[in-house]
Amino acid sequence: MAEKENLLHLDDNNFSTEIASGLVLVDFYATWCGPCRMLTPIVEQLAESEKGHAKIAKVDIDQAQETTANLQITSVPTLILFKEGKEVKRVVGVKDFDYLSELIKSHSE
């Protein structure tokens, strides 16, 4: 997968720091997950469109097992919106760009 400039890749070491401030939408995924692969271009598009408004990040559940366990991620893809380090919304499954963009906007104030 190509590295996108505005798309953060988080792991157990940097997760807490990166979600601590602002609005952050995190996509919990697995490389072996078909629906996760379908969601990737949508998440990449969000990273571009939300630049300056919200951070968009991905977490590979197989590489960040501690974070995944702490947040009780049981299905992928799972998207969690954090505001100032606190979870404000969790959605499971593939969602379209408009839904996710609206979700971010609804929590941006």
Tell where the protein language model's regions lie, with residue ranges:
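N-terminal leader/targeting and pre-domain segments
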Residues: 1-22, 106-109
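Conserved acidic residues
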Residues: 11, 60-62
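Short pre-active-site segment immediately N-terminal to redox-active cysteine/selenocysteine motifs
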Residues: 22, 29-32, 75
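Conserved helix-turn-beta segment immediately C-terminal to the redox Cys motif
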Residues: 25, 38-59
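Structural cue for short, hydrophobic secondary-structure segments
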Residues: 27-29, 81
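The canonical Cys-X-X-Cys-His
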Residues: 33-36, 79
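Structural micro-motif
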Residues: 65, 71-80
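Non-catalytic, surface beta->alpha helical segment in thiol-disulfide oxidoreductase systems
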Residues: 75, 83-109
